[in-house]
Amino acid sequence: ISSAASDVYKRQAKNQLDDFTHTCFMVTPYEEYTAVCEKLNELTPGDHEKRSALFNSGAEAVENAVKIARVHTGRQAVVAFDHAYHGRTNLTMALTAKNMPYKQGFGPFAGDVYRMPMAYPYRWVGNADTITDDAFEAFTSAVHAQIGEQNVAAVIIEPIQGEGGFIVPPAGWLKKVADWCRENGIVFIADEVQSGFCRTGDWFACDAEGVVPVSYTHLTLPTIC
């Protein structure tokens, strides 16, 4: 990577190596950690108060987002979607929809994880003109029947699913799900580890839909608001 980088990037990397301290922030706080968190708070959508924390991997970020959602709501159930990929730890494998090569032989997995159908325009068997409303109705009806809204701590979704096949949900569906979560006191977690930081043209894939998640995970860093 460094051989292909410009001299500017190389100088910045060297400066970081001169100053970097890889320690647990809770034991030995350091300025660079705080600076990164402040920048994340500035960049993520919404003008509300935000708090950021840095972790070692995307899976660890997702695990912490789920833990915080459970403590915050006092609920346990977590909803994920078909075709999802969220990591390879025990909980994130439970959230991940693909058995091979991620999950085979590694169970049993964490409980209280429920999977719902994804709004997938290319594979949708219903009316393509009404997929946004129909897929949202299918989602809310399934949650109500199988779990109960009052038991759901979090709904976690990749705004654009990566490992599932670069699946872009229909316009408006993501916002409907996010608004429904707020109405029911559920934490809406956007996992943008693969779609965040300008990979879609916007800083975050949620920006295109005007969605402000309660919790973000991105580039192996979660921002919890």
Report the location of each language-model feature.
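PLP-dependent aspartate aminotransferase-fold enzymes
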Residues: 38-154
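Conserved active-site segment immediately N-terminal to the catalytic lysine
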Residues: 205-219
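Glycine-rich phosphate-binding segment of PLP-dependent enzymes
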Residues: 3-28, 35-53
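Active-site nucleophile and cofactor-binding loops and adjacent substrate-binding regions
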Residues: 25-32, 52-59, 82-83, 194, ...
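Short, small-residue-enriched loops and turns at beta-alpha junctions
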Residues: 122, 162-164, 196-197
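Catalytic PLP-binding core of fold-type I/II PLP enzymes
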Residues: 167-201
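Short acidic, glycine-rich surface-loop motifs adjacent to enzyme active sites
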Residues: 150-165
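Single conserved hydrophobic/aromatic residue that forms the stacking wall/gate
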Residues: 1-5, 9, 218-225
